[in-house]
């Protein structure tokens, strides 16, 4: 994502059960928008012509994220864009806790065939206004987050630590960690499991 550019930024906060707009702006990427991105988002070069470059928004973006949890549907992907833009703008990248609603949906909704934002919002009956636009996706993700958190609580994950444990359980990192605890001489093919 370091070579790619943001064309729109939106942040909302979930406060007291309400979704509160924090920041929203089109962003001038300083170069032509690839046609596939325009096709997906509807954002054109003409739309961003008078928009601020990310560098002008960077202090506001950083401020919007401080003392908050960065939540996104595929958080690692979105964070790679945000952190790259902040770095490019010379703005310090805040160390923020992150929560990925895709990972949370995998644990809370294991029966769904897919965990895309479209599938998860459909499951919860959440309507997305402006799909593939930053503000529409941010609001939809906030709505999904509220429902996922309620469902996670029924699974015993009510605290930040429990949510982190739930979303990382069984991931590649956890599997690698478990494997690293095994003796080097361990042969999984010779292991007899109890009947």
Label each PLM-derived region with a short phrase.
Residues 103-111:
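An acidic intrinsically disordered interaction segment
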Residues 1-98, 110-132:
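Conserved non-catalytic scaffold segment of RNase H-like nuclease domains
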Residues 104, 120, 140, 144-147:
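Generic recognition of well-ordered alpha-helical segments
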Residues 137:
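Conserved catalytic/binding loops enriched for acidic/polar residues
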Residues 63-64, 87, 91, 97, ...:
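Alpha-helix boundary/capping detector
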Residues 142-195:
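Acidic two-metal-ion nuclease catalytic site recognized across multiple nuclease folds
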């Amino acid at each position: 994502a370091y070579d790619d550019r943001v064309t729109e930024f939106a942040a909302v906060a979930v406060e007291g059960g309400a979704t509160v707009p924090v920041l929203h702006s089109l962003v001038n990427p300083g170069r032509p928008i690839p046609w596939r991105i325009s096709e997906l988002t509807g954002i054109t070069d003409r739309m961003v012509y008078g928009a601020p470059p990310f560098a002008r928004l960077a202090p506001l973006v950083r401020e919007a994220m401080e003392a908050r949890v960065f939540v996104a549907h595929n958080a690692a992907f979105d964070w790679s864009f945000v952190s790259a833009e902040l770095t490019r703008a010379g703005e310090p990248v805040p160390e923020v806790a992150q929560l990925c609603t895709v990972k949370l949906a995998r644990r809370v909704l294991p029966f769904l065939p897919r965990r895309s934002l479209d599938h998860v919002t459909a499951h919860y009956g959440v309507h997305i206004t402006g799909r593939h636009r930053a503000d529409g996706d941010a609001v939809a993700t906030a709505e999904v987050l509220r429902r996922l958190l309620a469902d996670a609580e029924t699974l015993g994950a009510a605290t930040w630590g429990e949510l982190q444990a739930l979303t990382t359980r069984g991931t590649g990192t956890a599997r690698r960690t478990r494997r690293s605890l095994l003796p080097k001489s361990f042969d999984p093919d010779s292991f007899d499991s109890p009947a």
